Amino acid sequence: MKNLVVVDHPLIKHKLTIMRDKNTGPKEFRELLKEITLLLAYEATRHLKCEEVEVETPITKTTGYRINDKDIVVVPILRAGLVMADGILELLPNASVGHIGIYRDPETLRAVEYYAKLPPLDGDKEVFLLDPMLATGVSSVKALDILKENGARKITLVALIAAPEGVEAVEEKHSDVKIYVAALDERLNDHGYIIPGLGDAGDRLFRTK
């Protein structure tokens, strides 16, 4: 798992534990997902380049640094990825936002695309793909396929929890993509859910079950 970075931080561990609790309600669950995404983004954006700018303080002029976040694209996988987008956009408010709709067929576990709306993607854009649960990896692999078909070349995948199977699937198909997660869990069960995981993130966010 050469491309995997598990962001080891006490705040992330604390907040993720609350999210795992089956008794945590949707309001708190949403807030925690947004907060953890913000913390993950701190590390996932570490490679971004800064340009020097001159700034005038109340005392004197000095050299500062600026990220051109207009060259950044945030792409959540619907629907649970939407909340993650809110977190990263607090740090990068001028980033463009695309959306990819993919669901995993419960019988075949294959990824099915039902929606894609993306801003212009060229090789210079820094793209952050957001997928809360990297389980089998089929949804993330499909989304990465779509992004690259549309011209993206610099892509970082940010997930809340990953299973080893999902990480391996992404690395096999997209070895150039770095993966940042809050936790690497044990395995998948027979239904393709992460163990111990936190259940279906989308259902818990939107109370659809």
From Swiss-Prot:
**GO terms assigned for molecular function:** GTP binding; magnesium ion binding; uracil phosphoribosyltransferase activity
Record-linked InterPro entries: PRibTrfase_dom (IPR000836), PRTase-like (IPR029057), Upp_B (IPR034332), UPRTase/APRTase (IPR050054), Ura_phspho_trans (IPR005765)
Its gene is: upp
Q: Which family does it belong to?
A: Belongs to the UPRTase family.
| Cofactor stoichiometry and binding remark | Binds 1 Mg(2+) ion per subunit. The magnesium is bound as Mg-PRPP.
| Pfam families for the chain | UPRTase
Q: Which pathway does UniProt place it in?
A: Pyrimidine metabolism; UMP biosynthesis via salvage pathway; UMP from uracil: step 1/1
Descriptive protein name? Uracil phosphoribosyltransferase
Q: Regulation of activity: what does the record state?
A: Allosterically activated by GTP.
